[in-house]
């Protein structure tokens, strides 16, 4: 059985599940999962775990993300992105860059979002997009997310009653960048939507080192498994602690050990090898997942 982390470059037009399905065929391996859903139209980094590495996928999913995209101000859509139907138009003839930058900065920090109707969030066992497709509107729970950075990365282009510019956002798990784009428009007094998006970093993996499905397929055919990263890549967002060989033995038996840390979860290493995910219990740490077996 092969095992490891893959830094997949997801292409437009496929769901995250589609990507996993195709990788199962390419690798002839059933035990594969992804660390953070991307909408079909969104491209970029999709962390993939294979084999034993699927045991750390939840920690990859929890990690922060970085996106680059484009916001169009002047009209909004049903889906909050370019795939939806236009629902409101507010023509714009001028927009000051400093005003936009100030508005974007106001979203940095802890903010509250309401998931869009066209999303996979479940309400009463049913996904929101299923309600939306049936023409139903349901009450959606608010969620707290953290925006570390939200900045404009290009000049503002004014054309045909719209304003467009590119942006970069660094955010926590669960952030809807579509909704952030719409809320920015509201703050500026205009209808808006997210017109393009790609994920450039997730769980420590970056776009410049990601590989497409076709590249991975070619490597597999050539007998090259260098696309598989060690399982350690899946825990790099957790605080790392070094343990002794005696501690390593205790961990292998599932026993508590003392660790000089106040973090609720840590990744225990012996040298450069991750042994376990350890969970704080009072003054000691208990193995939550032993990975070295």
From Swiss-Prot:
Q: What does this protein do?
A: Responsible for synthesis of pseudouridine from uracil-55 in the psi GC loop of transfer RNAs.
GO MF? RNA binding; tRNA pseudouridine(55) synthase activity
InterPro entries on file? PsdUridine_synth_cat_dom_sf, PsdUridine_synth_N, tRNA_psdUridine_synth_TruB, TruB_C
Provenance organism: Streptococcus thermophilus (strain CNRZ 1066)
* Protein's name according to its UniProt entry: tRNA pseudouridine synthase B
A single BP term in Gene Ontology: tRNA pseudouridine synthesis
Which residues are catalytic? 39 (nucleophile)
Give the family, as the similarity comment puts it.
Belongs to the pseudouridine synthase TruB family. Type 1 subfamily.
User: What does the record give as EC number?
Assistant: 5.4.99.25
Q: Which gene encodes it?
A: truB
């Amino acid at each position: 059985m092969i095992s490891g982390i893959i830094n997949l470059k997801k292409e437009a037009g496929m769901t995250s599940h589609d990507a996993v399905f195709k990788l199962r065929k390419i690798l002839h391996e059933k035990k594969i999962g992804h660390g953070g859903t991307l909408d079909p139209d969104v491209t970029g980094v999709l962390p993939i775990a294979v084999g034993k590495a699927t045991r750390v996928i939840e920690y990859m999913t929890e990690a922060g993300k970085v996106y680059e995209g484009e916001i169009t101000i002047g009209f909004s859509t049903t889906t909050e992105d370019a795939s939806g139907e236009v629902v409101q138009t507010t023509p714009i003839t001028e927009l000051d860059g400093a005003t936009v930058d100030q508005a974007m900065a106001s979203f940095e920090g802890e903010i509250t979002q309401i998931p869009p109707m066209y999303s996979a969030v479940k309400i009463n066992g049913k996904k929101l997009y299923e309600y939306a497709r049936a023409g139903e509107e349901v009450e959606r729970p608010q969620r707290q997310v953290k925006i570390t950075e939200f900045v404009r990365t290009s000049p503002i282009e004014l054309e045909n009653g719209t304003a467009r510019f590119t942006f970069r956002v660094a955010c926590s798990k669960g952030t809807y960048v579509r909704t952030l784009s719409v809320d920015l428009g509201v703050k500026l007094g205009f209808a808006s939507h997210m017109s393009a998006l790609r994920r450039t970093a997730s769980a420590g993996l970056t776009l410049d080192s990601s590989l497409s499905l076709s590249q991975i397929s070619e490597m597999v055919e050539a007998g090259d498994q260098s696309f598989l990263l060690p399982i350690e890549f899946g825990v790099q967002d957790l605080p790392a602690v070094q343990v002794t060989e005696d501690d390593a033995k205790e961990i292998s038996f599932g026993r508590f050990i003392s660790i000089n840390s106040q973090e609720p979860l840590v990744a225990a290493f012996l040298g450069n090898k991750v042994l376990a995910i350890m969970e704080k219990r009072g003054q000691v740490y208990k193995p939550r997942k032993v990975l070295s077996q």
